[in-house]
Amino acid sequence: MKNTYNLRSITAKAINQVLDQGQSLSTVLPKLQQNITDKDKPLLQELSFGVLRVLPQLEWIIGQLMVKPLKGKQRILHYLLMVGIYQLAYTRIPAHAALAETVNGAVTLKHSQLKGLINGVLRQFQRQQLQLMECTQNNSSHHLHPEWLLTRIQKAYPQQWQQLINANNKKPPMWLRVNRIYHSRDEYLTLLRKSGIDAEPAPKSPSAIRIISPCPVTILPGFDKGWVTVQDLSAQECVELLKPINGEKILDLCAAPGGKTTYILEIAPESQVVAVDIDEQRIKRVKENLKRLNCHATVKTGDGRHPEHWAENQQFDRILLDAPCSATGVIRRHPDIKWLRREEDIAQLVQLQSEILDAIWPYLKKSGTLVYATCSILPDENCQQISSFLKRHSDAKLAGTETNDCLGKQIIPELNGGDGFFYARLTKR
């Protein structure tokens, strides 16, 4: 049975909703995927993520191929052209199919009169592809980052910025966390190999496995039974730094979607975990993950700046604060971050992090441990944030995560195979 939709036009709509309406792909794609077949969902994701990964390059190429940019109601066709060029430059889709489907996308988008324009621009790109792609390696579009973010990264990492940028522009690896309640990591590796899935263990993590060629979770042995969870290596490490212990009261603040909550409970299944997040919709994901993994926690909707509304005068032995942040360490996983984030957001996020840290500190027991974590690579949110916190709180001290140049542990993307992350482990005197 032939599909009644055009996938390229749907992708153009996804790009439009990100760039012109400020929505994230993680919000946009699930809604758009409701009306397409399971077979087409990976391609929609590949095209949407791919276009946003190399956006400046596509913008520059279209600027070379067209005299006037498409504006107003025709702007959606600008994004359709991006989808077409991305297919020709970066995918194995046969050129004739990429052209035909993209041109038909103009009809689906109710711009039949511009089919010829779309066809002409794409064919012109085909003729000039080698020359144009070579030019993009030597012009302002080369780094594939907004100028403000590139400048900040260069300032923060004068020796490593190129490595960091290159990592951001790659497709991310797929990491798993083995639930050791059911299997050891080596046992699960054997199950993967028996299923024909190539994988390798992380050198220093007790639970992490990297899938060599990312695959649907539905084919992972025991995924629906809670044997394994998809979670980046760096995200796993911050829970390991927390060192949860059975019998303790543990708070996971800003917990959604619940990956760290469930890992706490896998390490210490008899701990009393409270998982809190401000987003009611994302709290549903926490509950879903707890159910799949057969874990039990108290789940609450609440603002980290106002624990008096949900903490009920409790004090905790350990607190994991995965703070709201710029997410600049996970750009390879969420390339839309580059275009949704604004430079002025950083100061606001730093202020929010500071307020949450100050508000939650009194709820940590004496001699208790707090792990502050972000998926950011920017010093303002990380080392500098912890430096300011230590100056405000004389009863706080770092506990073994500091390095020579940082009050905590800063990981840049791909350094250990994981995402960009920051951790600081604090104890209360």
From Swiss-Prot:
GO cellular component assignments: cytosol
Localization in the cell: Cytoplasm
InterPro entries for the chain: MeTrfase_RsmB-F_NOP2_cat, MeTrfase_RsmB-F_NOP2_dom, NusB-like_sf, NusB_RsmB_TIM44, RCMT, rRNA_ssu_MeTfrase_B, rRNA_ssu_MeTfrase_B_ent, RsmB-like_ferredoxin
GO molecular function: RNA binding; rRNA (cytosine-C5-)-methyltransferase activity
Location (main, coarse): cytoplasm
GO terms under biological process: regulation of DNA-templated transcription; rRNA base methylation
Keyword Metal-binding belongs to the record: no
Keyword S-adenosyl-L-methionine among record annotations: yes
NCBIfam families, alphabetized: PRK10901.1, PRK14902.1, rsmB
Protein name as annotated: Ribosomal RNA small subunit methyltransferase B
Taxonomic lineage of the native organism: Bacteria, Pseudomonadati, Pseudomonadota, Gammaproteobacteria, Enterobacterales
